[in-house]
Amino acid sequence: MGFAEKFIASLSSRNLRNDAFHHDLDVIAAAALAGDMGALLCRVKYADGTISRLFEGNAGNLAQLLRAWTAAVAKKGQARRWVKATTAWDAQAANTLYRRVAEASLAHWLDSKCKVCHGTGVVSASEAGAPLVCQACHGAGEAAISCSGGFELERIKDMVSELEAIFQSHGARAMRRLGR
């Protein structure tokens, strides 16, 4: 069982005791102690109920994550020289690009499931009755990233992989804290 599965299982625990026999909250404690951005990603994606749920989660965590991620994307964009900002207009365009990339990459990472097949990769055929490969995602179960152009799309894909790397390293640090 991976870190995400253990974290989700800990969230639904009915036993809040923490003694020699009950260890349900250890994963949540390890997640909190393992880091800042990864812990926030974990909280927003799995604990706040913002993904495909009918209730509102903690919008403050999502807003905090969006601010932190936008600042991180701007820093990465400047370091990687995505846009040469020589004039005030260039700086404004660069900031707009950083914000759009941050918002789109975070939205895709938080909920990348195909809306047509709900992430399964197959849809039921009404006439034949047999399942068919989803045409929207071509059976992958992951929705395509929608944006205006190729330049922006490549930056969004790059930042989605950065988010996944942050989350994976956070999970590894948390599992080390658990001693497993």
Regions inferred by a protein language model and the residue ranges of each:
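Long, charge-rich boundary regions
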Residues: E142-R180
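Cys/His-coordinated zinc-binding microdomains
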Residues: H118-G121, H138-G141
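N-terminal alpha-helical interaction blocks
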Residues: M1-R100
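Short, flexible, mixed-charge glycine/proline-rich loop motifs
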Residues: R100-K113, G121-G129
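The −1 position to Zn-ligating cysteines in a subset of zinc-ribbon hairpins
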Residues: K113-V116, V133-A136
